[in-house]
Structure formats: C-alpha cells, structure tokens
Regions:
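Glycine-rich phosphate/diphosphate-binding loop of Rossmann-like nucleotide-binding domains
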Residues: 13-16, 28, 32-40, 144-209, ...
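Phosphate/nucleotide-donor binding subsite
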Residues: 49-93
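Glycine-rich phosphate/nucleotide-binding loop
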Residues: 110-123, 127-137, 216-220, 224-335
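N-terminal charge/polar-biased segments
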Residues: 1-5, 11-15, 29-32, 49, ...
Length: 335
C-alpha cells in the first residue's frame, strides 16, 4: 500500500513526520510512503535504507496553521498538501495523511478529489476507545453548523465505514444528545431524530456522552462543534490520566503507598490509558470525499504519524470511499 505523507504539516514538521515514517516502515512491511515536502529534508542514507519503499516528492510551499483554507487553495497549488492530493487523484498513491491545517486539508480534498455524489458535506470520523473496543464518532470538527439531513448523512457515512472497520454487517448508530428520550435536545437533534428513525440504519435512538466510553453503539453522530469539544476533552483526559500515573509512581511521591503502587502498576490500567491516547489512533478519517484521506493532529508525535499512516492504509485497503459512494447511489437521501 502506497501512502502520501505531507512532510510539512505538523507543529514539529518535518522531524515528526520523518521519524514517524521510520516507525511505520519498520512495523508495516507492506507499506510504501511518498514523503512530500521541501527538497533535502531526508538524507540519502535514510532513503537507501528502505529499499525503494520511501520516495521524496518535492513541494516548495508550506501551508500554515493559521492560513485561510480558501486563500491557500487559490495561491498554494505547489504546497506539500496540494501535491499530496494531486498524487492521490492521479492514482500514484492510495491514500493521503496530513497533520496540517484541517480546513486547508478539507479544502484541497474537496477541490482536487471531489465529493461523493449526494453528500452535502464531508465529515471527520474519529475512533474513540471504549471498554468494548472502539466507537466511531462523526463529525469531530469539519462542520460546526449542520442541518438535520447532514447529521443523517454523517450517520450513513459512519455506519458504512464502521461495517468495514469493525467487520460488522449492521453496525449500530446513536444520535448524541442530553438524554435518551426522543423528546430531548434542541431543534437540530429533534428533527434529526425523526430522520434517523425513518432510515434503514440500525438506529438505537439518542445516546448520552457516557455511551461512547461504554461502547453502547458502534457509531455516534453529532455536529462538528460538539464533536470537536468531545475530542479535545478525551485527549485531555488521557493526558491527565497518564500524568497522574507517572506522578503517583515516582519513587518520592507522597501518594506512593504499596497499595497504590500495586494498583497503578497493573498492566490493564496502563493499557487503558494508552488506548485513550490520541497517538494510538493517529488521526481522523475524512468521510465523503473520493479518496482515503486522514487528518492527523497538529501536535502529532512520530507514534501518531505512524498510526495515521496505518489508518490511511486501512481505509484505502477497505476502499471506504467507494463503499460510501455505492451506499449513497443506492439508498441515501439527498434532499
């Protein structure tokens, strides 16, 4: 599987990307990476060390985190982000990963790859760890203002992706709300509930925030404003838990009692905290565009980049965008 990586995207670019590639190529033997960025960012020894599995494609321009997506699409057609999308469009790679400006990644994907026919707005889907495995949450930041039909489409895209990611024939979906009763919520969620209820999806109804960590449903749908706040909270929770664990295990910690140390040292606790870490999931799937695109976190570490490359390879291998296209061609409402 051949994936293009935007070398200039993250806050720590290009070092995080280059180190992440090394981790990915060492672990994923079927992976090939096309690194897109400024010439000379990778030395010849590193290139030669991966026997043709690593290629550098030059791109002179860089998209900044604070730049307007609309402006960069017009002005920076030779940016690393734009070149990645062009490689995917031309079929030279099977997927794209970028830890850059999310709005710009979305804009380049829309203008270069195009949108699945019938999809009003593409959405970002992120895997949240649960006590049962994972839940796919859609949308986590692409659309802060949405309409009921768009939420329904998020559900259709999310359940289609989940059926392949989770290997389930009929994944369940819930609408994130402040209560499980069908009368709860605001005008958006109330009207969306009616659409979900009439759909052919395995709709379980409204779900509250605690349903995500419990793994009550396979897919949770919300608007991007709520979803992004939820994502940042989950990331913060993982960081706090990890920090507390290290603090309590310090040899001179006042909290370090034998009982605490025994409990905190349990492998199951460490495993849970690691699963909560955003680095383990790498990035978010862009659902609704014609291609496999993963948006990684701006502060991605090498481990996060490695896992984002894995996610993109999986999405490409499962052909998620094509399955979503078929689903919308067959059953999805567009008006």
């Amino acid at each position: 599987m051949r994936i293009a990586l935007d070398a200039m995207g993250s806050d720590n670019a290009p070092s995080a990307e280059i180190e992440g590639i090394a981790l990915a190529l060492d672990e994923l033997k079927d992976l090939e990476v096309v690194l897109v960025g400024k010439p000379g960012i990778v030395d010849s020894e590193t290139m030669d060390g991966y026997s043709g599995r690593l290629e550098l494609v030059p791109a002179a321009e860089v998209v900044g985190m604070n730049e307007s997506p609309y402006e960069v699409v017009k002005r920076k057609r030779n940016s690393s982000m734009a070149v990645c999308m062009e490689l995917l469009k031309q079929g030279k790679v099977s997927g794209v990963v970028s830890a850059g400006n999310t709005g710009a990644v979305m804009a380049f994907a829309l203008t270069t790859l195009g949108v699945v026919p019938g999809v009003h707005r593409p959405a970002l889907g992120a895997l949240f760890p649960t006590i049962k495995g994972s839940t796919l949450v859609v949308d986590i930041g692409a659309n802060v203002d949405t309409k009921p039909l768009q939420l329904l489409q998020f559900g259709i895209m999310g359940t289609t992706a989940a059926s392949y990611l989770f290997k389930k024939a009929n994944p369940s979906v819930g609408l994130l709300n402040i209560g499980h009763e069908d009368s709860k919520g605001n005008e958006l969620t109330f009207n969306a509930y009616q659409l979900f209820k009439q759909s052919e999806m395995n709709f379980v109804g409204n779900v509250e925030g605690n349903a995500i960590l419990k793994g009550t449903v396979d897919v949770v749908v919300c608007d991007g404003f709520v979803g992004n706040a939820l994502l940042k909270y989950a990331e913060g929770l993982a960081e706090v838990l990890s920090g507390l664990l290290e603090q309590y295990l310090e040899p001179d910690s006042e909290h370090r009692t034998r009982r605490w140390r025994r409990w905190l040292s349990k492998p199951v606790l460490r495993e849970f905290i690691e699963r909560m870490d955003y680095q383990e999931h790498g990035g978010s799937l862009m659902l609704g565009v014609l291609g496999a695109v993963v948006v990684a976190h701006g502060r991605s570490t090498p481990r996060a980049i490695k896992n984002a490359l894995r996610s993109a390879a999986t999405a490409a291998q499962d052909n998620l965008s094509e399955h979503i296209r078929h689903r919308f061609a067959e059953t999805a409402p567009t008006t």
